[in-house]
Amino acid sequence: MAPSPAAAMPLAAEPDEVVVEVEEEEERGVKGGGGVAGLDEVEGLVVGSYCHDVLLRGGRVVGETLGGAAAFVSNVLDAASPAGASLAVVSKVGHDFAYATAAAPARHPPVLCASPTTSFHARFSDDAASAHAPDRQLRRVHACDPIYPADLPDRRFAYGLAVGVAGEVLPETLERMIRLCRAVLVDAQALIRAFDGEAKGGGAVRHVALEATPYARLLPRVAFLKASSEEAPYVGVETARRRCCVIVTEGRDGCRLYWDGGEARVAPFPAVQVDPTGAGDSFLAGFASGLLWGLSATDAALLGNFFGAAAVSQVGVPTFDPKMLQAVKQILEKAVKRPCTHINGNTFTFQRSSMHDELHKSLQEAAMLVCEQKQANSPATDNGDVCSINELTSLPS
């Protein structure tokens, strides 16, 4: 896709303009109140950059799409959150950004930088991935500017999601989010990703131990940390669960929640897998939406699993069927008589509720309808180059 005009995008601040001293911040405070009085006042903050994703199989390009966790996350939050919940997205792109008119960036415009847009090449193997093994090799080709603390809006938020993919969410930026938001949810990939030198044709994504990063000290102030089964060993679940609730996605086995004193397994949903990119991002957004609806953490993970599974049925950021979204909201309205956000930074209910099984059954029926429609409408497409659609699977980690 040819680059879109970026004249309407705000320009990024220079690095020497973005240092915010804690003492100065505490002196002047931030705009807005600290509480979440009612659902009509709930605003979320998503921090992470939009990207260019290039999908390859067998040495050839099979897809070029909008990427970046912020795109997938805002897509689900905009679609699934209860009425009255709003969203602000802080993302950075370069002048070469090719998707300014795509749905997510159009609703939540990024900040324009001199650096090129962050770009990833995802190389898929010819063999089908197992339930837990990585099904792609990811390489960062370009990296846009980091997101600095001063890039964040100067007001309070009910919740925040730190969803960096290329190291753009700096430790001081996450700390600023924690001060602005009543509760912060973090994707582990924003904390533990490292990149080999691009100068050598590398840029390969690898992981480092969370405890060895500057982010580790912030965990006690984080509400939820999401990791894939591949990332979990680097997170150190047993240590991290004593500081915050850790959610580990386990591919077609669903997910598990670990908190200090308990854990729970949450069942998956069927899916026609075409492209696993963004499954974990969509899971985290679905989970946050569940909390906004007033579900317990374990019940909210059902909504996370549902949207993670729905996301893999299309290449790139998915377009959800309006009838499916309507059905999901009707299910939630029936389960929760009046939405009352549980993202309040103080109290979370982790255990499954008495309606958990019924909620899973209802969402599973909606998921099966999506699968049947996908198989009927798209029995053979170019998307099959990315991943087989011949059998039902469940969301990847």
Swiss-Prot record:
Coiled-coil regions listed: none
Keywords (A to Z) from UniProt: ATP-binding, Kinase, Nucleotide-binding, Transferase
Similarity section: Belongs to the carbohydrate kinase pfkB family.
Entry superkingdom: Eukaryota
Protein name per UniProt: Inositol 3-kinase
Origin species: Oryza sativa subsp. japonica
Enzyme Commission identifier(s): 2.7.1.64
Keyword Kinase: yes
Tissue specificity: Expressed in roots, leaf blade shoots, leaf sheath shoots and panicles.
Gene this protein is translated from: MIK
Reactions the enzyme catalyzes: myo-inositol + ATP = 1D-myo-inositol 3-phosphate + ADP + H(+)
Molecular functions (GO terms): ATP binding; inositol 3-kinase activity
Matches recorded under InterPro entries: Carboh/pur_kinase_PfkB_CS, PfkB_Carbo_kinase, PfkB_dom, Ribokinase-like
Lineage: Eukaryota, Viridiplantae, Streptophyta, Embryophyta, Tracheophyta
Cited SUPFAM superfamilies: Ribokinase-like
